[in-house]
A protein has these predicted regions:
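Extracytoplasmic/lumenal domain signature
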Residues: 1-39, 72-112, 119-127, 139-167
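Repeat-blade elements of multi-bladed beta-propeller folds
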Residues: 41-71, 85, 110-135
């Protein structure tokens, strides 16, 4: 009601010399190399925000890296969390709950900023609280929205960066 900032979640970890805001940022930093913080890292969240009233979770879809070429932003490789991910947060505190990364080490602008749709589905005879997402990488994802577990990933468009997604 005051307009004061309630919380902030960083998609890309900062300079390790400055310490990390929480364990999630330490975990993310372990997936980067070089001095990524000097380049910005990217990973902006500009569209895909979905609130789950039933589970009281906020899901955000994140963007691609910057610079887009991973050899520049993270020369030693790595998954570069939380780029091209769906991240679940506690909406009251901003604390990290879980994530699923759709394009580890993303270097093709296959961001995950597309819509995130929630549904209760019947899968293999079981009721599942699902999250569905079709990012730019050509795969349609179904994820258990309680735990972030991948349930299905099927191609919906031609893609030459991957033949399939391991379950």
């Amino acid at each position: 009601q005051t307009g004061a900032l309630a919380w902030r979640f960083y998609i890309v970890p900062g300079n390790p010399a400055d310490g990390f805001e929480d364990d999630a940022m330490k975990m993310a930093a372990d997936t980067w190399s070089g001095s990524w913080w000097e380049h910005g890292g990217g990973g902006n969240a500009w569209h895909a925000f979905t609130y789950d009233e039933e589970l009281d979770q906020l899901y955000i879809g994140t963007g691609n890296g910057s610079p887009w070429n991973r050899k520049l932003r993270s020369p030693g490789g790595g998954d570069n969390l939380f780029l091209c991910s769906i991240v679940a947060l506690d909406p009251d505190t901003g604390k990290y709950l879980w994530h699923y990364q759709t394009v580890p080490g993303e270097t093709w602008d296959y961001n995950s900023n597309m819509d995130i749709v929630l549904a209760d589905l019947e899968l293999e005879g079981k009721s599942v609280k699902a999250l569905m997402h079709a990012p730019k990488n050509g795969f349609f994802y179904v994820i258990d929205r309680k735990m972030g577990t991948l349930l299905s990933a099927e191609k919906f468009a031609d893609a030459n960066w991957a033949t399939h997604v391991d379950l």
